[in-house]
Each structure stands twice: as structure tokens, then as C-alpha cells.
Design a protein with these regions (language model features):
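Non-catalytic pre-domain segments flanking phosphatase-related domains
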Residues: 1-6, 19, 25, 209-213, ...
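Active-site neighborhood of HAD-like aspartate-dependent phosphohydrolases
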Residues: 1-57
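Short catalytic/ligand-binding loop motif for oxyanion handling, primarily in non-cytosolic enzymes
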Residues: 13-16, 20-21, 91, 100-104, ...
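Substrate-recognition element of Asp-dependent hydrolases with the DxDx(T/V) motif
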Residues: 66-71, 75-109, 113, 130
């Protein structure tokens, strides 16, 4: 049996498409439908911090906004097939989402997951919501979750620093994390799930440093502090970041 944590937005759900829709609902045709951010903060979008704040304000006022996200069909399909053909695994869908009008984030996520046809079958599947991605590592450590996948490189590095047991954290390749020097990467959720089946992680540390600076990422406390400091700046508020 394995305990596995899977991020939702950027792994199962297409947040980018939904956020583009929110932008264009305020400023028609501001972003092309096929726009792809090249970093977490959407700096190539041309949106100012004030404009991003305005988009988030509208999202937060939209009832049950999280229910409207499209799924990454390949990843959702891979998870559905994996759960249908495996037994006795604990799968946690862990997401950091801003609070919006309507149902709670957890309930919206639960309804969305069911609408995608995801069923645990002979496994257990639960939902965990956190207010910020930098809290995921604490949750995983407390629950002794052994495997995780995320599209945010800081979260993957932080989870890789869990010291009380061997946690195997992987980064799902996306355009907004391509410059992060994270060794444990996969191209698809299916690739990650096959690693869970194998039971072995890639050798070596999760990462060494981020390409844009000297934030070391190894196994010492200074790395954890540096990662937390970065998350405090970038992930502290939805208005500064693409996502919490």
C-alpha cells in the first residue's frame, strides 16, 4: 500500500484556461485562448499586479468558480485507470485554492472530481485543501504521505526536505516550471504513477538550485528556510501569484 498526494490545479485541472477566461471577461481578447505562461507569476502576460488583483477579485465573487475548470484529460484518465486496476492505496488530492463565493473549496473540488469520473474503486481517495502551497509539506509529513506530485517547483523542493521519513516528491513538467533545476520530474501523471508502482524514486536530491538565483535546495535546514522565504513572497497572496 502507498500513500500518494496529487496536486489538482496544473496536474488534473486546467487552471490556465480558466484564468484566461476570467481575464478576457474583464478585458475582451486581452489574452489569446492559447496563451501559455512561462513562469508562475504570468510575467509574459503583460498583466500588472493591479490587474491580476482585479481578476482575482472577480474570481472570488463568482459562485463556485472552481467547478468550471476543464480537466487535463490524459492525466485524469491515467489516474482513473490506475485506481481501477490497483488496490489498497490511499490517494489524497491536495490543493491550494483561493476561497470563492458558493460552496467550500473542498466541496467544489469533490464535485469536480466526481464529475470527471474519478472513483477510488478498491482504494481510498480523499481531498485536502490548504490555504497556501507551502503548507503541503507539513500535511504530508504529519500524515506520513510517501509520494507527491505538483506543478509548483517550490512545493516539490519543500516536500523533498521532509526528514522524518523518505518522501518522494516529483515535479510535473509544465511551461511555468521549466527553468527550475528540479531533478525529480515527470512528463505525465501516468509516468509518476508508474514510479509509485515501482516503489523507487530517482537517486539523489530533489534539486540543487533554481535557475534564476542562488536558492540552494538540498537536505539541510537552510534550504528549507530559503524555500519558505520565497513562498512567503510569491505565494502569500493570490493577487501576487497565479495561484495560492
Amino acid at each position: 500500500m502507498a500513500k500518494v498526494a496529487i496536486d489538482v490545479d496544473g496536474v488534473l485541472a486546467d487552471f490556465t484556461k480558466a484564468f484566461i477566461g476570467a481575464v478576457n471577461s474583464i478585458w475582451p481578447a486581452r489574452l489569446k485562448p492559447d496563451f501559455v505562461p512561462t513562469d508562475w507569476d504570468w510575467t509574459n502576460s503583460g498583466l500588472t499586479h493591479g490587474e491580476i488583483s482585479k481578476v482575482w477579485w472577480k474570481i472570488k465573487k463568482t459562485s463556485n468558480w472552481w467547478l468550471g475548470l476543464d480537466a487535463y484529460s490524459d492525466n485524469v484518465g491515467a489516474l482513473a485507470m490506475w485506481m481501477a486496476s490497483r488496490t489498497d492505496h490511499d490517494i489524497w488530492l491536495c490543493t491550494s485554492r483561493a476561497v470563492v463565493a458558493g460552496l467550500t473549496c473542498a466541496k467544489q473540488t469533490d464535485i469536480w472530481v466526481q464529475s470527471c469520473g474519478l472513483r477510488p474503486v478498491n482504494n481510498f481517495m480523499g481531498i485536502i485543501t490548504v490555504t497556501n502551497g507551502n503548507k503541503k509539506s507539513m500535511v504530508y509529513e504529519a500524515a506520513e504521505i510517501e509520494w507527491s506530485i505538483d506543478d509548483k517547483w517550490e512545493t516539490v523542493i519543500d516536500c523533498g526536505l521532509i526528514g522524518s521519513f523518505e518522501h518522494k516528491a516529483y515535479l510535473l513538467n509544465q511551461t511555468w516550471n521549466k527553468d527550475a533545476s528540479v531533478y525529480r520530474r515527470v512528463n505525465t501523471l501516468e509516468d509518476f504513477l508508474l514510479k509509485v508502482d515501482d516503489g523507487k524514486a530517482n537517486a539523489g536530491p530533489v534539486a540543487v538550485r533554481h535557475a534564476s538565483g542562488d536558492r540552494a535546495a538540498g537536505v539541510d535546514q537552510s534550504a528549507r528556510n530559503l524555500t519558505a522565504a520565497h513562498q512567503g513572497r510569491v505565494g502569500e497572496t493570490s493577487e501576487r501569484s497565479r495561484r495560492p
